[in-house]
Amino acid sequence: MGQKINPLGFRLGTTQGHHSLWFAQPKNYSEGLQEDQKIRDFIKNYVQKNMKISSSVEGIARIEIQKRIDLIQVIIYMGFPKLLIESRPRGIEELQMNLQKEFKSVNQKLNIAITRIAKPYGSPNILAEFIAGQLKNRVSFRKAMKKAIELTEQADTKGIQVQIAGRIDGKEIARVEWIREGRVPLQTIRAKIDYCSYTVRTIYGVLGIKIWIFIDGEE
């Protein structure tokens, strides 16, 4: 059986960069990692609570964290920052203050910036949120997958693969369904592939969504 490696870790240093940029003494590394995870979770929860109600998509593609001696710089890459900014004009300042209180970092200042992504549906995280929203609203999984593929076509991607696993449509036996459009060369290290795995809770149980997007070709 072929084993599937995580496509992002597989390409680190070639087409994929790190989402956390900092150095620490070996004994402090685990603390730094836990802090990063807490920052990411805190931001995601805040955005979830304060987004406009009508939107089921949080629109966070990724969160990058850069740490210096006196500063923690957090860059949130969002597909639809308007939804957050319109619902709370002072949202970013408020988030910054709450995060600073939460982490009580005495000698480190915390700074948050939001960057808009030009083609939000080219990001697997945003697409996975879209599919999750559809599945929660009891839209058929095939319809949700096809709609997601249509949305990526607007973002000029070269290929996409979507996989949903679990008790699909409430069936008794769990199964895996997938659909692919275009090329998705997982074995080519120079191929820029974006990937995410996402868990969605439906009334029938937990479903897992995996999305691979082939962005641009081998140089």
Swiss-Prot record:
Entries under PROSITE patterns matching the protein: KH_TYPE_2, RIBOSOMAL_S3
BP-aspect Gene Ontology terms: translation
Gene3D superfamilies the record matches: 3.30.300.20, Ribosomal protein S3, C-terminal domain
Keywords: Chloroplast, Plastid, Ribonucleoprotein, Ribosomal protein, RNA-binding, rRNA-binding
InterPro entries: KH_dom-like_a/b, KH_dom_type_2, KH_sf_prok-type, Ribosomal_S3_C_sf, Ribosomal_uS3_bac-typ, Ribosomal_uS3_C, Ribosomal_uS3_CS
Pfam families: Ribosomal_S3_C
A molecular function (GO) term: rRNA binding
Signal peptide positions (record): none
Principal place of residence: plastid
GO cellular component, one term: cytosolic small ribosomal subunit
KH type-2 domain span: 43-118
Subcellular location: Plastid, Chloroplast
Subunit structure: Part of the 30S ribosomal subunit.
Family: Belongs to the universal ribosomal protein uS3 family.
Name of the protein this chain belongs to: Small ribosomal subunit protein uS3c
Species annotation: Panax ginseng (Korean ginseng)
